[in-house]
From Swiss-Prot:
Pathway: Amino-acid biosynthesis; L-proline biosynthesis; L-glutamate 5-semialdehyde from L-glutamate: step 2/2. Its EC number is 1.2.1.41. The keyword NADP applies. It catalyses: L-glutamate 5-semialdehyde + phosphate + NADP(+) = L-glutamyl 5-phosphate + NADPH + H(+). GO terms for biological process: L-proline biosynthetic process. One of its GO terms (cellular component) is cytoplasm. This is Gamma-glutamyl phosphate reductase. GO terms for molecular function: glutamate-5-semialdehyde dehydrogenase activity; NADP binding. Keywords: Amino-acid biosynthesis, Cytoplasm, NADP, Oxidoreductase, Proline biosynthesis. The keyword Oxidoreductase applies. Catalyzes the NADPH-dependent reduction of L-glutamate 5-phosphate into L-glutamate 5-semialdehyde and phosphate. The product spontaneously undergoes cyclization to form 1-pyrroline-5-carboxylate.
Length: 436
């Protein structure tokens, strides 16, 4: 049955703007590796030159958001400091230095004498990205799009509107000095335009939502365009009975507190019953000192946690200094809990038992499964992908942090010399199928 779409059709103006991006993306797909790299460097120079304007616009956005009562987690994502801007610009330079994802020959096969098949990576075309709060996402996404030969239509949250306008203005200035058309990137500014974007099938090839689970599901339900979903980040850390308690505490603190508003911060801590008391003796004062509110099940409350965890807490993404704690009897119970309440984002185990670690890594079906390290490593930049366009929690690829490799597809090229299928049907010719 055909999907029922509930959003309004795109306006003629939006269709025309999208067609401009589509046209520019065709030209961009023909640009050389050097041309795309040079364009990104020019973008970084323009962003650096306009940094004061960008930060001033962000300050205005943050002030307005505070006046409107935006929650602390979203305010944290919205705020763009000098350091965050510098890191974002450096991320673009790293993307420029990455290997070219276009034109990679994945398959080369002789089908018959002088009949050769190739499978070669090519850009997707035009990607549409809808995201909430984070203005640094504009730079990440645009750089990945240009590097991978794709046009990009961007729609940020209204709370970051002034910042996004200044960032895109700077990036377009950089592109205007390159061989790539500035129309390769386009910023949408209204909710009506973002709804219209969902109706641009035939022009837009992929939509990537970055935000709440509600946003992702709304987009999936209201577009015929393929969606690369990035939903809730309900991440877990399980601390096993065989463990270095001090190391496990360091991992837990980093996973929760290093940046609590991130989607790869843990929301639930699972403790083996044999170490729960001794671990919480160390952890409760450490977390209290950092301002973390612990919510525990009945057993963990008996070991000193004051606030009771409700059933809804196990499936809540706090994006804040809150952490649910549950005591389990085994790694199997921990994995069952993760399977029931997790979002298939990133889950970790702290243990010195290699067999337990192996079982956990091979059983937990998340896009990232870690052993003895923080969940905060679930990030394209930290993986060496450069900036990331998002994290996909779906099973089909691309999965996990999506960088350049997730923004290309492939095309089959077949070169012959007058070959016709009839000759193979009647036996005049046979397939050799030799990989070259």
């Amino acid at each position: 049955m055909e999907k029922q779409i509930l959003v309004p059709s795109p306006t003629d103006e939006l269709v025309n703007r999208a067609l401009e991006v589509k046209s520019a993306s065709v030209s961009l797909s023909q640009c050389s590796n050097d041309q795309r790299q040079s364009a990104l460097i020019l973008m970084t120079e323009a962003l650096s030159l306009r940094s004061s304007e960008i930060l001033k616009a962000n300050s205005d956005d943050v002030h307005r958001a505070e006046q409107e009562g935006l929650n602390q987690a979203l305010l944290s994502r919205l705020k763009l400091t000098e350091e965050k801007l510098r890191i974002s610009i450096e991320g673009i330079r790293q993307v420029a230095s990455l290997s070219d994802p276009i034109g990679i020959r994945q398959l080369h096969r002789e089908l018959n004498t002088n009949l050769y098949l190739q499978r070669v990576t090519v850009p997707l075309g035009v990607i549409g990205v809808i995201f909430e709060s984070r203005p640094d996402a504009v730079m990440q996404i645009a750089s990945l799009a240009i590097r991978s030969g794709n046009g990009a239509i961007l729609k940020g949250g209204s709370e970051a509107s002034l910042t996004n306008i200044e960032i895109v203005k700077a990036m377009k200035e950089g592109l205007s000095k390159s061989d790539i058309q500035p129309e390769s990137i386009c910023l949408l500014k209204t909710r009506q335009e973002s709804l219209g974007l969902l109706g641009l099938d035939g022009i837009v090839d992929l939509i990537i939502p970055r935000g709440s689970n509600e946003l992702v599901r709304f987009i999936q339900d209201n577009t015929r365009i393929p969606v690369l979903g990035h939903a809730d980040g309900i991440c877990h850390l399980y601390i096993d009975s065989a463990v270095n308690l001090n190391q496990a505490l360091d991992i837990a603190i980093d996973s929760k507190c290093q940046y609590p508003a991130a989607c790869n911060a843990i929301e639930t801590l699972l403790l083996h019953k044999d170490i729960a008391a001794s671990f919480l003796k160390l952890a409760i004062p450490a977390f209290e000192k950092l301002g973390v509110t612990l919510l525990g099940d009945e057993l963990s409350q008996s070991f000193g946690i004051i606030t009771k965890a409700e059933e809804s807490d196990w499936s809540t993404e706090y994006l804040d200094l809150k952490l649910s704690v549950k005591v389990v009897s085994s790694v199997d119970e921990a994995m069952l809990h993760i399977r029931r309440y997790g979002s298939r984002h990133t889950d970790a185990i702290a243990t010195t038992n290699k067999e337990i670690a192996r079982r956990f890594l091979r059983t937990v079906d998340s896009s990232g499964v870690y052993h003895n390290c923080s969940t905060r490593f679930a990030d394209g930049f930290r993986y060496g992908f450069g900036a990331e366009v998002g994290i996909s929690t779906q099973t089909l690829p691309p999965r996990g942090p999506v960088g350049l490799d997730g923004l290309v597809t492939y095309r089959y090229f077949l070169e012959g010399d007058g070959h016709i299928a009839e000759d193979f049907s009647n036996g005049k010719k046979t397939f050799s199928h030799i990989d070259l």
